[in-house]
């Protein structure tokens, strides 16, 4: 049986990977915003936001996860991009 310390260490590793992926997502979103601005397109795309949430819900359901929790997480990521965009003119997604 795995002890508590080992499980916590594994959980910490997963948490750090999640943070790394969020960082990667933010960087990609920033690059998308730059491309949109150069093309004269609006940085906010409500259709894309909806698509992101639908894809997240579908994937969560396939993994037998609670979709509401995943939607909340994705909305936080989108909200983060919105606030960053407002502060520095970057895109959402």
Role assignments for model-derived ranges:
Residues 2-85:
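N-terminal hydrophobic or amphipathic helices and topogenic motifs
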